[in-house]
Amino acid sequence: HGVYTSEVETSLTAPIVGTAGLQVIVGTAPVNMLKDPAAAVNVPLLVNNYKEAVEAVGYNDDFEAYTLCECISAAFSVVGVAPMVLINVLDPAKHKADISEKTMQVNDGVAVLDEVGVLLEGLTIKADATPLEAGKDYTTTWNNDGTLNIVLLKGGAGEEATTLTATGSKIDPSKVKAADIVGGVDISSGKETGLEVVRQVYPKLSMTPGILLAPRFSADATVSAALQAKTKSINSVFGAVCIVDINSKTDGAV
């Protein structure tokens, strides 16, 4: 008789650290899961492990929609290499879609908003047409598939509700195009986007880009050409290589 404990090894192996051949990856991520999604748009983010990566850009297993997550999984769950620099170009202010009013069933004080990519800012939750206040009447948690739990709080206005309604907006990765990956420099503000952000890696992180990638997007000829051009004379000093996708569709060799 008694209580016995055992320690199980984590499923994530400790990554091998090496700054030679530093990966700099441009793509999309579920930044709606962050406290400040806008802060993770078109900036170089250095990550050393899986936890840091998830905290930096969020995570979702839908690799077709969220290309940076595919690299996070490959680097930290499969191969075990670190660090790498992530540049997310999915902008919640631009790449988004409306969520029409949805009715949710409440079970044991929890309702699930069955939409992926929900933006918490601007989300309206109602119980019997009465708007609920986040933090006072309910809290939210993310599910592994990217959907959102609405957890009703005791003493809140919706405590006894059996159904809730939700309206708002969500990020839409399908609206990110090749031009967003290639990026540019805004003439009036000087703000760099897309591959132009590669220039910021050395002055901000004191690390030199070694391998440039834009997974899935680099199957596009324009993105591929931009990647190759960007490998030359980074910060007027450094050189790099790039890895591009090959279009495997029937018209890929045309």
Question: Which sequence ranges carry the predicted segments?
Answer:
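Surface-exposed assembly/interface segments
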Residues: 1-254
